[in-house]
Amino acid sequence: MNNPALPALYAQHLSVLKQRADEALARSGFDHLVVPSGTQHWQVFDDRDYPYAVNPQFKHWLPLTRLPYSWLVYTPGRRPQVIYYQPHDYWHVVPDAPNGWWVEHFDIHIIRKPEDALALLPNPAAHCAILGEPQSALGAAPDGIYIPNNPQAAIDYLEYQRSYKTPYEIALMREAQRLAVRGHRAAEAAFRDGASEFAIHMAYCGAVGQDANDLPYGNIIALNEHAAVLHYTDMGRSPPALAHSFLIDAGASCHGYASDITRTYAADPAGEFQALVDAVDAAQRKMGSAVRAGVDYKQLHVDAHLQLMAILKDFGMITVSPEAALATGVSAAFFPHGLGHPIGLQVHDVAGFAASDRGGRIERPAGHPYLRMTRVLEPGMVVTIEPGLYFIDMLLEEVKKNGHAGSVDWKRVEAFRPCGGIRIEDDVLCTHGKPENLTRPAFAQAA
């Protein structure tokens, strides 16, 4: 990534994190913030490890995603420290020597064995707020055991504040968009060439330069009726005899930050399914333009149901009004997931339900159990906007069982079933004014 502004943006970002850490420690009554990067995990009855996943609290401070057995230590008023695990190992590639825009801001201690960190961690352990997984525990009595205690007051505050992205974070998320769009373009080309789902996936990974261990989530590459499976990840090795549609939900990572993008393509650009895709795309753009400060995300979700049902009404697939389809649950059969979620260090980022930085929960509206965001939007938040329309046999059968078969024109629905469904997703930044769509400009630049 070649962004000359990044060092200055990172310095500002680090200043914000220090201020947040000061408050989190004050609220939780601890003297030191200690964040392990995480450990390798091993498969049961085997000597093979699972892919390493860094602690999100660690990569919030440091652009390091492949550094197990390391630690961040922050004490208010002092220079932060990084305990950097770089073993002597001829079996595996070891982490590079510390380098990059972050190095000048930390005291760095190289260790060769995980237990070497004990001599460098603040003492006593009881004075430390340790944020991590249980497997990161280090030490033994009587000298002290550094067991992640995850004090709730600190977690509540830090996760809530993560909703407000710094300019540094936005810069990395923009780059994650650019990388993902490169893959989306390659995937669409492979689809147009008649490739299988697996071959499309490989084209995507090759264009992005990331594999399953790097991508922020497993790619969804769905041809035809497979698009009716919301998280379809099977990836058929052979192409279908006749391609009708292609749904791709795939992102990319940039120094620990994620993008999450979905597009749907029709094999026949002059067909009725293409017209339906175009209608959902237009509605999705409108939904994205509503990501404004002070708007309740729950209301955006309900409004999305009404807009999508209006499309189905226009296409003759439902016989009732959008309002009636929503009230009777018919809309949930066609749009069974939430409008979106927060995104950042994690694809489904934290604090989507948080009532405040002191805890509490804002519940989902009744009848919408899969919504992942219930907060009022504020500047600095980044959310996905991902409406969808699907033809899922199981859910459509429930419409019939619930006595609402007359609300649906089944012949019209049957005509679209071979296409599976449609989902279109962008990542959108809430600002003090107009929202900034982070995804669409990346597609325009890659055209």
Segments from the language model and where they lie:
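Active-site neighborhoods and metal-handling regions in enzymes and metal-associated proteins
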Residues: 1-447
